[in-house]
Amino acid sequence: MQKKYYELFFIVEEQYKNLFLDFAFDLGIEAIEEKDNGVYIRSHESLEEFSWALEIFAQKLTTTFNLNHKIISNLSLVEKENKDWIQEYKKGIKPILVDNVYIHTTWQEEKKNCINIKINPALAFGSGHHESTYSCVKFLQKFSKSKLRALDLGCGSGILGIIMAKFGCNVEICDTDELAIDSSLENARLNGVDFHKAWCGSIDKANGLYNLIVANIIADVILILEKDIKNHLEDNAILILSGILDKYSTRIKEKFQDLELIDEMQINEWCSFVYKNNKKG
């Protein structure tokens, strides 16, 4: 084991965090940890070039979203004494119980009398602890039913798609990051379920109508995809929207006011909404 390693830390606005995580994965970064309201990246190789690339990426996002403030802050790069970070990482991840769904890692035991969801968090995009994912898991236990045609839009690690499949839905998944698709398919295999279709891209590549769509993605993307989402809803279909910071909730409600809002939940600053496709007028 090498004696030293490099640690890069930065704080990023929550709604843009996944963009930065995707960026890091695309550049071959593997040791990523979300902690202390920020992101830690560790490597035995120098991270100076990546730190520079990160700042350029942040500047481009600031321009793209026409922001008047910085997306990232507290950027620091230090050299530290080495540890067995794999074991440290494993110690830091706890299983999560949401009603009757128990989400755990590949190295943790299953829970009796629960629907067990096994996730390899090293593959990509989280292990179910985020507030928006928690809300989706609660809602999916209520609205997932056998034989429904369902779509996990922005699937990430595949947790939500796997849950729908466990409830008997015919599940399709999509994500704009190919790594997320690969990770979701691997996690599905770990859980003994199959997705009927999986593609790299968004809902514009979907064919036909769905009885259930879950979109746990940031508000900006939901607003962009609003028409495409509605165009793929079957009559009386259920739509679950999550990953929405409370400051965007009014805009989301205005955009989807032609659908019937039947349930909602807020945990800390994160909002989730459930709509039924009973279009008004």
Curated annotation (Swiss-Prot):
S-adenosyl-L-methionine binds at T133, G154, D175, N216. It is found in: Cytoplasm. Keywords: Cytoplasm, Methyltransferase, S-adenosyl-L-methionine, Transferase. Gene3D superfamilies: Vaccinia Virus protein VP39 (3.40.50.150). One of its GO terms (cellular component) is cytoplasm. It comes from the Bacteria. It catalyses: L-lysyl-[protein] + 3 S-adenosyl-L-methionine = N(6),N(6),N(6)-trimethyl-L-lysyl-[protein] + 3 S-adenosyl-L-homocysteine + 3 H(+). It holds the Pfam family PrmA. Its EC number is 2.1.1.-. GO terms for molecular function: protein-lysine N-methyltransferase activity. One of its GO terms (biological process) is methylation. InterPro entries: Ribosomal_L11_MeTrfase_PrmA, Ribosomal_PrmA_MeTrfase, SAM-dependent_MTases_sf. Methylates ribosomal protein L11. HAMAP family: Methyltr_PrmA. Belongs to the methyltransferase superfamily. PrmA family. This is Ribosomal protein L11 methyltransferase. It comes from Campylobacter jejuni subsp. jejuni serotype O:2 (strain ATCC 700819 / NCTC 11168).
